[in-house]
């Protein structure tokens, strides 16, 4: 029977409502209670299995990143995990990963028909604001079979240490036995003495669970809406254009014209930009949620939505999958993937552009060396279909007809109304009377990942002529490794870009160009406590952000520049 993946938001809401009520349960509520208890029981049992068990949570989580395998154990030119990011296999590899995890859940007695729910990240409340993270993902305890147990959906305690031994990485992602995964605003960096000291201080400041849950929900909501609140010294609070919000990115990625562009950030950056909104890949909002849940450093911020020193496990590829929320997040990502397929008539076939840079491995993965060509026939290691064969992307195109009793469907979700193609959307920033949605120019920031350790965010600002304010017009979260600077292939190949298309309406709103006045554009990289603006700042802006400037790296952020249209 085809398994159905339901909204965890709905299941969690009905479950806790039922537990707090003395009234008889209706059918939907009773089913929700039974379904959620099966999900919790299955994951709880997987977490209790010894690490060497093929179906243990430790083993399954370890497929993604740590513990590293093969050449990637020490060689920074290789990725020591099996996951695919920034290439065309990102959606399909993670689709297979979820199936493997779900299959393991189904080995637990009494859970043979369980399906993994999805955290519906785009669900809005009656005020059109993002819903909080489902309560079952943030409670410390869960009552199962008459006993209160450590909630296996909230955190996981390592049953075996993780040794991060990549050359030049300073053991940053090493974790001891019994390490407990954490989320924003806490830190889980304990691999070396400096990180342990910083983490001890950070977590002492955020020791109260309920308060941390409030801060986590606020932070995720801020990312989803595109609201950013930073130090008011010359940079005023501003709502970011919808295309830079995570809600907007999830919406706009459904307009990507090809699977190649839709699938990953590398191909997204190579796509032509001649319309608004610009092409967005599924991987882009996916990255942002990782950073929102795991945390990243916001220097000088007064708002609790962005707290310095927050470095939870979801913020890094190496350890993200050990946080149980990872799988519910990726289940939503797969829901959006399937929605894109339905929207574009691609439920039975997906095509990869073999000439696209996203169809080539940038660093070695598994036993595939750098520069390996990727296709729908590439093995999705380590997932075995038979004793001799691996699953391939072409096996997973139609989710309802995957062989071997692996077919599944999605229950109702917040983006179901986008299953049909829509007309082009007008620019969210328009002139006072008439909006011009034609792209007039594109601005670009290029950042070398090797210069910045770990994950970071590229940000772009515009300063209207004659004004003291900076308006943020674009941002791109980059989910990255700590040890990229030791990777020869990464240094040579892995520049990342933020591209911001500017329509006539946006330029009119900013008050320049067509009026003969000059708009100033500035770039910034925000990561691990530093706000690195571009070189040659005007004194006014430099003074306004002086508190946040610790180092300026002109080689890391190139001055925002015009880009010719169309981009290729």
Model-derived features: positions:
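C-terminal accessory segments of proteins
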Residues: 1-568
């Amino acid at each position: 029977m085809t398994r159905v993946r339901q909204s965890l938001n709905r299941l969690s809401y009905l479950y806790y409502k039922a537990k707090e009520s003395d009234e008889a349960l209706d059918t939907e509520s009773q089913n929700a209670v039974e379904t959620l208890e099966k999900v919790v029981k299955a994951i709880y049992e997987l977490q209790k299995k010894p690490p060497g068990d093929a179906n243990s949570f430790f083993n399954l989580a370890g497929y993604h990143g740590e513990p590293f395998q093969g050449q990637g154990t020490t060689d920074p030119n290789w990725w020591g995990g099996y996951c695919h990011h920034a290439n065309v296999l990102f959606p399909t590899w993670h689709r297979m990963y979820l199936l493997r995890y779900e299959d393991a859940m189904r080995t637990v007695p009494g859970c043979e028909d369980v399906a993994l729910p999805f955290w519906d990240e785009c669900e809005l409340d009656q005020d059109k604001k993002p819903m909080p993270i489902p309560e079952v993902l943030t409670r410390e305890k869960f009552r199962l079979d008459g006993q209160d147990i450590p909630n296996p959906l909230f955190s996981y305690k390592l049953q075996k240490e993780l040794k991060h031994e990549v050359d030049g990485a300073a053991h940053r992602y090493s974790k001891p036995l019994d390490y407990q995964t954490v989320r924003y605003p806490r830190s889980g960096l304990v691999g070396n003495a400096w990180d342990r000291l910083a983490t001890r201080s950070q977590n002492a400041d955020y020791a109260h669970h309920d308060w941390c849950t409030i801060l986590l929900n606020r932070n995720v909501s801020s990312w989803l809406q595109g609201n950013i609140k930073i130090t008011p010294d010359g940079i005023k609070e501003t709502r970011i254009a919808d295309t830079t919000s995570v809600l907007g990115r999830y919406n706009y990625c459904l307009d990507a014209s090809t699977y190649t562009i839709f699938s990953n950030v590398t191909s997204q950056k190579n796509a032509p930009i001649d319309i608004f909104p610009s092409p967005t890949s599924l991987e882009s909002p996916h990255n942002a949620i990782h950073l929102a849940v795991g945390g990243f450093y916001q220097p000088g911020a007064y708002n609790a939505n962005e707290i310095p020193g927050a470095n939870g496990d979801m913020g890094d590829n190496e350890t993200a999958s050990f946080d149980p929320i990872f799988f519910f997040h990726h289940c939503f990502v797969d829901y959006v993937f399937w929605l894109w397929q339905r929207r574009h008539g691609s439920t039975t076939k997906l095509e990869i552009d073999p000439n696209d840079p996203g169809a080539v491995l940038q660093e070695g993965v598994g036993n595939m060396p750098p520069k390996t060509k990727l296709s729908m026939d590439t093995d999705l290691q380590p997932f075995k279909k038979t004793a001799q064969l691996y699953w391939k992307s072409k096996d997973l195109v139609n989710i309802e007809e995957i062989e071997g009793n692996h077919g599944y469907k999605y229950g109702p979700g917040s983006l179901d109304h986008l299953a049909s193609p829509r007309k082009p959307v007008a620019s969210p920033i328009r002139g006072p009377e008439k909006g011009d949605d034609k792209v007039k120019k594109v601005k670009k920031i290029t950042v070398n990942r090797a210069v910045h350790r770990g994950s970071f965010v590229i940000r772009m600002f515009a300063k209207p002529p004659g004004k003291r304010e900076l308006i943020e017009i674009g941002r791109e979260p980059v989910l990255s490794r700590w040890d990229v600077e030791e990777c020869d292939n990464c240094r040579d190949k892995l520049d990342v870009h933020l591209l911001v298309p500017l329509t006539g309406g946006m330029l009119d709103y900013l008050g320049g160009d067509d009026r003969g006045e000059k708009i100033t554009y500035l770039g910034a990289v925000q990561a691990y406590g530093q706000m690195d603006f571009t070189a040659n700042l005007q004194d006014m802006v430099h003074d306004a952000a002086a508190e946040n400037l610790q180092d300026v790296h002109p080689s890391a952020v190139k001055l925002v520049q015009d880009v010719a249209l169309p981009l290729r």
